Regions:
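Active-site Tyr-X1-5-Lys
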Residues: 149-176
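Substrate-positioning beta->alpha
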Residues: 155-162, 189-196, 209-230, 237
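N-terminal Rossmann NAD(P)H-binding glycine-rich loop of SDR-like oxidoreductase domains
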Residues: 9-33
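Amphipathic terminal alpha-helices
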Residues: 307-320
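Conserved Rossmann-fold NAD(P)-dependent oxidoreductase catalytic core, especially the SDR/UDP-sugar
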Residues: 97-98, 106-153
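NAD(P)-dependent short-chain dehydrogenase/reductase
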Residues: 168-215
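NAD(P)H-binding glycine-rich loop region in Rossmannoid oxidoreductase-like domains
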Residues: 43-106
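Mid/C-terminal beta-alpha module of Rossmann-like enzyme folds, strongest
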Residues: 23, 225-280
Length: 320
């Protein structure tokens, strides 16, 4: 769905001040879209309004309020970016994740239902490659999803998949696009110049677990935003959005430590670390599969500008 530059196409963005939403809003504006952003914070609303974006202060948990907004705004496209995972926590804290779980489940159900009622022509939602189970084979969009993890990690995966189901089933099943994004890096993320990853590596508190065989598929936030934008015109489907250079944790963790001129990261046997302490971190570092972006390249015509995390990380942490 393209704009002629006359503002004839309108878009509503959730998470418009987030790590993907922020560059997406800038991209939409540069392409002539009329942009409305749903934000929870009044201060963000004032900043957005000053940049030519219509800001609506509200909460996705307020289902009726979101419905009124959609009916009033009647956007052509809904970009649901409030669901993006901008961090890789060492453990999932149920209390801290409660808002995210609410957005993925109740918030998505409400806004998708309202979007359909308002006649939205395309819904694009950001999910995560976290939904893929351990495998030695590269995960494609046809790979069965779900993990056997219990506790909060399992709740997160189930919530993401439930969110995906709402989007994929929207309308007659032909208006929803789900983007399973890789581990985000860049401004505002865990992997940023002043992000938590750098602190942990400098303190030698980001270990390699076991043999470090978990495969990371990274994605720069600007490439993610470009993919979300492209999804506005892509065939309704699920797409993996990752760079072209999947890498084992045994390789990327020391690489970043070297960029930071930090001491070599510790390497812990799994029996010492105790995977039950953090099923997510254990999965990411030891069992996560590589992910293929072939479908997105072919059907969305999307190609990552930063094709390798190596170049992207070197931009963030240039050697001095």
């Amino acid at each position: 769905m393209s704009s002629s530059g006359t503002g004839s196409v309108s878009a509503l963005v959730t998470g418009g001040t987030g790590v993907i939403g922020n560059p997406l809003v800038s991209l939409l504006r540069s392409r002539g879209y009329d942009v409305t952003v749903l934000t929870r914070r009044q201060a963000h609303g004032k900043v957005l309004s000053g940049s030519g974006v219509k800001a609506c202060v509200g909460d996705l948990a307020d289902v009726e309020g979101v419905r009124r907004l959609l009916i009033s705004a009647k956007p052509n496209v809904l970009f649901h970016c409030a669901t993006a995972l901008a961090w890789v926590p060492s453990r999932f804290c149920a209390r801290k994740l409660t808002p995210a779980l609410r957005i993925w489940k109740t918030g998505t159900e409400g806004i998708v239902s309202a979007a359909v009622e308002a006649g939205v022509q395309r819904i694009v939602a950001v999910s995560s490659i976290l939904v893929y189970p351990a495998s030695k084979e590269a995960a494609t969009e046809e790979t069965p999803c779900g993990v056997s993890a219990r506790g909060t990690f399992g709740r997160v995966v189930r919530a993401l998949l439930e969110m995906e189901d709402w989007v994929r089933g929207a309308g007659d099943g032909n208006i929803g696009v789900v983007l399973r994004c890789g581990w985000l890096y860049g401004e505002g993320t865990f992997f940023s110049a002043d992000g938590r990853c750098a602190d942990l590596l400098r303190q030698r508190r980001f270990p390699i677990l076991g043999k470090g065989e978990g495969i990371a598929s990274f994605l720069h936030v600007e490439d993610a935003a470009r993919a979300v934008f492209a999804a506005g015109e892509a065939p309704a489907d699920v797409y993996n959005i990752v760079d072209d250079d999947p890498v084992a944790s045994a390789e990327w963790v020391p690489f970043v430590a070297d960029l930071l001129r930090a001491d070599s990261p510790r390497q812990h046997p799994l029996w010492v670390y105790k995977p039950t302490r953090s099923p997510l971190f254990s999965h990411v570092m030891t069992r996560q599969p590589s992910v293929s972006n072939e479908l997105a390249r072919r059907r969305m015509k999307w190609v990552p500008v930063r094709s390798s995390w190596r170049d992207g990380f070197a931009e963030i942490w240039p050697k001095k």
